Amino acid sequence: MIVKLNFDSEIPIYVQLRNQIVVSIGKGDLKQGEKLPTVRQLAEDLGINTMTVNKSYGILKSEGFISIDRRHGAKINSTLTPGIDFKEKLDDELSLVISEVGLKGIEKKEFMDMCEKIFSTMKGIKA
């Protein structure tokens, strides 16, 4: 698993890690059922604190992207289903993104084309 963290970013490391794992699942780089590195191993590989990785894994688990078993470690969930909470979160986040897009002068067609292009690169999602 290739993870690139920006230590100068205002985005916390645990959020960057969480986001990169989600995108890797979406792109198909991480497959459903695939094991993730242990917290210790990933922390060592990235040069970060184990608590940072643990926090990312905890968020991913609570969001349903991964499951964690004491004996077998963390793995990508084989069934990913959206809940009502996720749809509400998505609505809020899309409202913000669309507002920013419009305020920055990007036309709807250009935005939709960008979305289509990105969506087409996501080999790990069932569409």
What are these regions (language model features)?
Residues M1-K35, E88-K89, I98-I125:
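Extreme N-terminal segment that seeds HTH/winged-HTH DNA-binding domains in transcriptional regulators
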Residues Y14, T38, H72-E88:
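Short, cationic-aromatic polyanion-contact patches
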Residues D29-L30, E34, K61-R71, N77-S78:
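Beta-hairpin "wing" of winged helix-turn-helix
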Residues K35-L46, L60:
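A short alpha-helical element within helix-turn-helix/winged-helix DNA-binding domains
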Residues D45, S62-G64, K104, T121:
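Residue cluster at the C-terminal edge of the helix-turn-helix DNA-binding motif
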Residues M51:
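Key DNA-contact positions within bacterial/archaeal DNA-binding proteins
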Residues S95:
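Interdomain hinge/lid region at the active-site interface
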